A protein has these predicted regions:
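Catalytic or ion-coupling anion/metal-binding cores of large enzyme and transporter domains
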Residues: 2-63, 67-69, 74-95, 100, ...
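Short, well-structured alpha-helical segments in soluble
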Residues: 112-124
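A short, small-residue-rich loop immediately preceding and capping a beta-strand
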Residues: 122-142, 153-158
Length: 397
């Protein structure tokens, strides 16, 4: 599903002198002379970068963010793919938004990361970008900033952590801590059990493996068309995740050379499909806030009325916690988002482009579903209408 050789939107290829970075490195002037000298200072030979697409690898890795602790290695895989495709990767550290540790809330800093992303891409000599993130607000922040600059861009989602385990229970990191904390308050479990739960709740790098905000927004990014197919559900520590990162590096170079920019991908139709997918997944209500903000950066008007209208046309087909029974690893091996979207084709805009294919239709062609208990048939939905209801009135200001 993540084969970098698949075609994508756009025709023709730009000449090296048409690249944005050429203005920094390729002209016969004092500034380019200085920039080339400083690139030598970085340890690069001219033949390693001159005339090649410069790809910014924006990495939200940090020691303090457990959702992203593996992204240091994934950035290396992305850079490997860029080198292999004939590009010149440069890694940029950007702010990390840790839902667990950042107080009073990372929401205060979403727009700060969006601004940082925008200004880094705008001010440096880069032709395209690969964005690495996944913990809740990181996904919208990175895509908001990138949308404002409108370069060729691929998003590499951090991926869900492994399922939690405690005795005979499978734990969902984003939900079961509340459940068992209430049980402790009620006196039904004690300190010994709580210590065991601490060991079993979060077992690996990656974001929460329930269909909470993180999984909802990375799924939205995939259906928007800015990730490789199937990328959003690959477990963070699965070797397939590293392969996806490398394939994303390969892919971005092709997108740069064909000048497939984010504005060609993030269309009104793409945002409608993202809303439909979030609703059919039974995803987080936080997606309402973030998708509206992302659409605004893309010049697309998206409102609560759109969520209400689309919710009446899509059933809930994903049996995922917290509203269902299963976790993201189950969803991935049941078919992931490609298989899931294959059951929503009647409400999707199938002729729009993605970073991987000329059309979403082509991207979904033949995508299987392996477990209809996890990804339900349309004839057997969890609910007849989407998972978000819009209320209005004096109790809903």
């Amino acid at each position: 599903m993540t084969d970098a050789s698949t075609r994508g939107p756009g025709t023709g290829r730009v000449a090296p002198e048409e690249l944005r970075s050429h203005r920094w490195f390729g002209t016969d002037g004092l500034r380019s002379f200085s920039h080339r000298a400083r690139t030598r200072q970085l340890g690069y030979l001219p033949e390693e970068h001159l005339g090649k697409p410069v790809v910014a690898v924006l990495n939200t890795w940090s020691d303090i963010n457990p959702c992203h602790t593996h992204l240091r290695d994934r950035a290396q895989a992305v850079k490997r793919g860029v080198w292999q495709a004939g590009g010149f990767p440069l890694e940029f550290p950007v702010s990390t938004l840790s839902e667990t540790f950042q107080k009073p809330t990372p929401m205060l800093y979403r727009n700060l990361l969006a601004m940082e992303t925008e200004e880094l891409l705008r001010s440096y000599p880069v032709d395209g970008a690969v964005l690495l993130g996944g913990c809740d607000k990181s996904t919208p922040a990175l895509l908001m900033g990138a949308a404002s600059v409108d370069l060729p861009t691929v998003f590499v989602p951090a991926g869900p952590m492994l399922p939690g385990h405690w005795r005979n229970e499978v734990l969902g990191s984003g939900t079961d801590m509340w459940k068992y904390w209430d049980e402790r308050r009620a006196g039904t479990i004690g300190d010994c059990e709580m210590a065991e739960l601490e060991n079993g709740l979060a077992r690996s790098p990656g974001h929460c493996m329930t269909m909470g905000t993180a999984s909802t927004l990375t799924a939205a990014a995939e259906v928007l068309g800015v990730t490789l197919p199937g990328a959003s559900s690959i477990p963070a520590v699965d070797s397939g995740h590293e392969r996806m990162a490398a394939a994303s590096g390969l892919r971005i170079v092709d997108l740069v050379m064909r000048q497939v920019t984010l504005s060609q991908i993030l269309t009104p139709e793409a945002y409608e499909d993202a809303v439909a997918t979030v609703l059919a997944l039974g995803g987080s209500t936080n997606a309402v806030i973030h998708l509206i903000a992302m659409a605004g950066r893309s010049g697309v008007k998206l409102t609560l009325d759109d969520f209400d209208r689309i919710a009446r046309t899509v059933p809930v087909l994903a049996d995922l916690r917290p509203g269902g029974r299963y976790l993201m690893e189950d969803f991935h091996f049941a078919g992931g988002l490609p298989g899931f979207l294959g059951r929503l084709t009647n409400v999707l805009h199938l002729d729009r482009p993605t970073v991987a294919h000329d059309t979403l239709r082509e991207q979904l062609d033949g995508a299987p579903v392996h477990n209809s208990a996890v990804i339900r048939e349309r004839s057997d939905p969890l609910a007849g209408e989407g998972g978000v209801a819009v209320l209005r009135g004096n109790l809903c200001p």
